[in-house]
């Protein structure tokens, strides 16, 4: 068991399956505990996601743990997500170990021997438990994948190592909640089942009173208390973990609603950092559509090519489906096109991968909408950055995560004047803008999180656009989330589980 220099507690949030809401439950508890005066930090031993972010000291971790750290009001560190797997094919992923790129592994190769990853995860957990009063541990997928159980260091092995009590989260919205909970508990070894101290039923729709007997039945069948039934709620804008959120409009039958600012984003097979678009998705003046399949883009004001973990592969996919013709037609009609990171690279002339960073070495012809040449290099750029959108007063801030180095010709103007990276002064240029200002690209993720950039961009699409007088900031969203969960959880029992007094 991990030994801390002071009395430390761990609470593990495990799931009956993937996407049952573990991340959002952990985020809510981080803010609830912090509001109660507890020094709390998040932890997830291994995350599989192309939605990552950069810590203040230049390390890459899952976006979910950055969000949880913000909710806990602590500085995010690599120890909060020591192993990050970034899928770049159907069977392989880049491994980021304690914040830095380590290797590229096939699924079979990764699971052949997990001792290196497990030891790094243990070291990080030990450091967190030495620094913080409570560590909220998020599990991965189902905590009861019995065919992988002996190699799973993310769920119950972490709980045993930290001495954590476990709360099991089930998603009633997908149906079969009794099977989820009872089935999960039934297959667990007795020593691990004994660690489960409570159950949370997530995403309930309708009148909770109608499920009171369901709660009693679950408690009778399992002998474990149900700590809360959480109603489905969309009133907060908090980044999703590793997939475009279920609320997103993907390949809708029609175009954008009349009166809305229509924005289309190409939904690449290896889309990354889709949370770059969250501020647009949550703006009531905007209708954002994620599109897999080519269609006429008439009715949309802008097309966004988001990030990609396999840029050349996704570019080949784009060509194979016939997207190029629709993109060029949209360009010819005066539509505004923006590329972010990998999407920016696709807007250039070519993408060269001489070292086979994303697969086979080679060069792929790009869309040639910006006069830019990109080479994928072996070293990854990881930075939090600030600057100004050139020619405007919009203050840009975001983060960079890319292997590419792009050279911009004089036919384009730079997009952003970078004034700082990782809190060090800089005077550099980022991105490119076409001569008519209708095509642009940048390496900055989270550009639209900055209200001045969002105002500038949407004003290009609709001159009458104005930001809402009161847009929910991230901290306000965490408070709304904490209030929502607090109203439906038995906090006295939860504080008792972590041996703390709830006041």
Swiss-Prot record:
One GO process term, biological-process aspect: cobalamin biosynthetic process
GO molecular function, one term: ABC-type vitamin B12 transporter activity
Keyword field contains Ligase: no
InterPro entries xrefs: Class_I_gatase-like (IPR029062), CobQ/CobB/MinD/ParA_Nub-bd_dom (IPR002586), CobQ_GATase1 (IPR033949), CobQ_N (IPR047045), CobQ_synth (IPR004459), GATase_3 (IPR011698), P-loop_NTPase (IPR027417)
Domain of life: Bacteria
Residues forming the catalytic site: 341 (nucleophile), 445
This protein's pathway: Cofactor biosynthesis; adenosylcobalamin biosynthesis
Keywords from the UniProt entry: Cobalamin biosynthesis, Glutamine amidotransferase
Keyword field contains Acyltransferase: no
SUPFAM superfamilies with a match to the protein in the record: Class I glutamine amidotransferase-like (SSF52317), P-loop containing nucleoside triphosphate hydrolases (SSF52540)
Domain GATase cobBQ-type: residue ranges: 260-453
Pfam families: CbiA, GATase_3
Assigned protein family: Belongs to the CobB/CobQ family. CobQ subfamily.
Function description: Catalyzes amidations at positions B, D, E, and G on adenosylcobyrinic A,C-diamide. NH(2) groups are provided by glutamine, and one molecule of ATP is hydrogenolyzed for each amidation.
Protein name (database record): Cobyric acid synthase
Native source organism of the sequence: Pelodictyon phaeoclathratiforme (strain DSM 5477 / BU-1)
């Amino acid at each position: 068991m991990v030994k801390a220099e002071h009395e430390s507690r761990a609470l593990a949030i495990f799931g009956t399956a993937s996407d049952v809401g573990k991340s959002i439950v952990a985020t809510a508890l981080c803010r609830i505990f912090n509001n109660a005066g507890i020094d709390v930090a998040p932890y997830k031993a291994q995350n599989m996601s192309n939605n990552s972010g950069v810590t203040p000291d230049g390390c890459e971790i899952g976006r979910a743990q950055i969000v949880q750290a913000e909710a806990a009001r602590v500085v995010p560190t690599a120890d909060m997500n020591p192993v990050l797997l970034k899928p770049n094919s159907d069977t392989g992923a880049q491994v980021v170990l304690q914040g830095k790129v380590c290797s590229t592994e096939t699924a079979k190769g990764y699971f052949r021997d997990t001792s290196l990853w497990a030891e790094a995860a243990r070291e990080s957990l030990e450091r967190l438990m030495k620094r913080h009063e409570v560590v909220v541990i998020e599990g991965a997928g189902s905590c009861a994948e019995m065919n992988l159980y002996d190699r799973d260091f993310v769920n119950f092995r972490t709980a045993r190592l930290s001495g954590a009590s476990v709360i099991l989260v089930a998603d009633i919205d997908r149906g079969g909640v009794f099977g989820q909970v009872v089935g999960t508990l039934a297959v667990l070894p007795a020593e691990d089942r004994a660690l489960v101290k409570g159950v949370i039923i997530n995403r309930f729709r309708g009148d909770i009173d109608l499920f009171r007997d369901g709660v009693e039945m679950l408690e009778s069948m399992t002998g474990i208390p149900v700590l809360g039934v959480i109603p489905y709620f969309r009133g907060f804008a908090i980044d999703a973990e590793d997939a475009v959120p279920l609320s997103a409009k993907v390949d809708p039958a029609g175009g954008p609603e009349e009166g809305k600012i229509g924005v289309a984003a190409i939904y690449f097979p290896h889309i990354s950092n889709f949370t770059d678009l969250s501020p647009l998705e949550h703006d009531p003046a905007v209708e954002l559509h994620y599109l897999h399949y080519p269609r006429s883009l008439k009715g949309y004001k802008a097309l966004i090519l988001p990030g990609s973990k396999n840029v050349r592969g996704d570019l080949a996919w784009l060509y194979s489906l016939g997207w190029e013709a629709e993109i060029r037609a949209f360009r010819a009609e005066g539509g505004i096109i923006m590329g972010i990171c990998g999407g920016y690279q696709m807007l250039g002339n070519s993408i060269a991968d001489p070292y086979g960073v994303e697969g086979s070495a080679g060069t792929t012809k790009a869309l040639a909408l910006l006069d830019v040449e990109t080479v994928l290099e072996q070293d990854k750029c990881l930075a939090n950055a600030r600057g100004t959108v050139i020619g405007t007063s919009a203050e840009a801030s975001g983060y960079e995560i890319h292997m590419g180095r792009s050279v911009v010709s004089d036919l384009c103007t730079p997009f952003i004047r970078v004034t700082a990276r990782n809190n060090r002064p800089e005077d550099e240029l980022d991105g490119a803008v076409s001569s008519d200002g209708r095509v642009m690209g940048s390496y900055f993720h989270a550009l639209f999180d900055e209200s001045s950039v969002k105002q500038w961009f949407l004003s290009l699409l609709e001159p009458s656009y104005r930001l809402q007088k009161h847009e929910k900031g991230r901290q306000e969203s965490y408070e709304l989330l904490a209030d929502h969960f607090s109203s439906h959880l038995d906090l006295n029992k939860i504080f008792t589980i972590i041996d703390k007094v709830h006041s």
